[in-house]
Amino acid sequence: MYLWTVDYYVTNYKDFNVENLHAYKGYLMEFFKPKTVNLRIQAINKYLDYIGKNKLRLSAVKIQQKTFLENVVSNADYTFLKKQLKKDGNMQWYFVVWYLGATGARVSELIRIKIEHVNLGYFDLYSKGGKLRRLYIPKKLREETQKWLSEEQRTTGYLFLNRFGERITARGISQQLKNYADKYGLDSKVIYPHSFRHLYAKNFLEKCNDIALLADLMGHESIETTRIYLRRTATEQQSLIDKIVTW
């Protein structure tokens, strides 16, 4: 990106002066997202340092945090998806969706859950720094999983397997969820693994307003990361405005 950015600037703006640099920044802000703008500004600034014109360095643009959650699966779609999967006899995927929505697991964590963890009722995870995080499996989910496993005559090993009997991959889960979204007429933009983690957090705060506990359950280093779940989705904001603003 560094060479491409500098080459583009030289081709289109030629001289490195205040006027041209601000014109270039304006162009970036009009056509690109803030993160991309900042990456290109960073490249230009490095070149300015290199040619001894560091006084002309451009300032980065401020990335505004959105005031709403994006692409979060609704409770209605979550319930509908589970219902359809169960109805069609796709029990493993019924449980994949249920576990994602009821444990707050990241997909990389979900694929590591073993039958032994189901029987225990939790799965202990350790971060790179050795910090412990416990992923709890709710009682109802645990009991239903045990019934399913009994029918499948499985007593040990990874909970979710692929068609070869090996541990399923995170990529495999993402792709299959997209396939089911298409099959059942759901928006594939919201039917992806992390969307269910967002749903878990939102539902948790609505039933138990303990943000510190949720931060621990989610494995967030900072409670500020968890605060985003206090926000509503864009759809919820629109619905609320439609009800409130009648003047």
Q: Each predicted region: which residue ranges?
A:
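Conserved catalytic core of the tyrosine transesterase superfamily
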Residues: 1-247
